[in-house]
């Protein structure tokens, strides 16, 4: 209610791990992944979030020692369909995320992600785009955005070192120009990591101070996004 009073929209994020991996060969583990993502959707709905985003198509940080198999792809699609239907009933859109090869082996590129979303084939299962991950995995940023554009619902604005957007070497002009070109008109969300949450420090491998304060990050990051938006939209 307080967020509503302030006029603030919100989104939410979730991940899966090895114990609830939606692409596990163990049906019980896959069922746990479905259950936990449905619970995350319920929490998002309770918080008034319009979207639940993240790489919850598979276990983050878990590696099989090989690339994705046909069975894993099938299990992933089958696991996501009931989750997407639950999201529809909750009026929550799912924004699946492709992450880099050092964090995930299942979905790394916008081509991978677009194929997965289309195979799930549910209107509440869509894709998100993250500038950090794409600058690791994609050869051509504009082409990557054009590939995912038909199923795109959410964008993470994230610097190459996870610090304040606009202070690193992400190709921001290419990103914003192409988002404008494809007609994107959804969320632009800062994703940055620092030292404030001890439980995230080890997970995100952040060992040094990335910005002066959370307030500085929010202020300067928002100003950067607004300046980019004002130049194009």
PLM-predicted stretches and their roles:
Residues 4-5, 22-126, 138, 208, ...:
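Active-site acidic/histidine proton-transfer and metal-coordination neighborhood
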Residues 11-15, 155:
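Generic beta-strand hydrophobic packing signal
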Residues 16-19, 56-60, 98-102, 131-133, ...:
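Active-site-proximal loop/turn and secondary-structure-junction residues that shape catalytic pockets
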Residues 1-7, 15:
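Aromatic-lined substrate-binding rim segments of carbohydrate-active enzymes
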Residues 4, 48-50, 107-129, 134-233:
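Histidine-acidic metal/acid-base catalytic patches
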Residues 8, 92, 184:
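Short phosphate-binding/catalytic loops that engage adenosine nucleotides
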Residues 10-12, 53-54, 96, 129, ...:
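Hydrophobic residues in well-ordered beta-strands that form the structural core
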Residues 11, 19-23, 198:
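Short active-site-adjacent helix-start/loop capping segments
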């Amino acid at each position: 209610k307080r967020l509503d009073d302030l006029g603030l929209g919100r989104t939410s994020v979730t991940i899966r791990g090895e114990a609830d991996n939606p692409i596990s060969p163990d049906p019980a583990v896959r069922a746990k992944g479905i259950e936990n993502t449905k619970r995350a959707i319920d929490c998002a709905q309770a918080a008034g979030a319009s979207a639940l985003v993240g790489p919850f198509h598979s276990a983050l940080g878990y590696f099989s020692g090989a690339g994705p198999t046909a069975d894993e792809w099938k299990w992933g699609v089958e696991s996501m369909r009931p989750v997407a239907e639950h999201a529809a009933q909750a009026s929550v859109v799912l924004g699946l995320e492709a992450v880099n090869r050092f964090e995930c082996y299942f979905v790394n590129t916008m081509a991978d992600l677009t194929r997965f979303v289309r195979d799930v084939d549910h209107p509440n299962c869509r894709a998100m785009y993250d500038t950090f991950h794409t600058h690791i995995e994609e050869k051509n940023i504009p082409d990557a955005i054009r590939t995912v554009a038909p199923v795109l619902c959410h964008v993470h604005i994230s610097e190459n070192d996870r610090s304040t957007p606009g202070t690193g070497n992400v190709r921001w002009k290419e990103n914003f120009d192409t988002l404008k070109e494809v007609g994107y008109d959804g969320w632009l969300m800062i994703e940055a990591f620092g030292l404030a949450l001890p439980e995230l420090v080890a997970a995100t491998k952040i060992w040094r101070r990335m910005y002066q304060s959370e307030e500085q990050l929010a202020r300067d990051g928002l100003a950067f996004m607004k300046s980019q938006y004002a130049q194009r939209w």
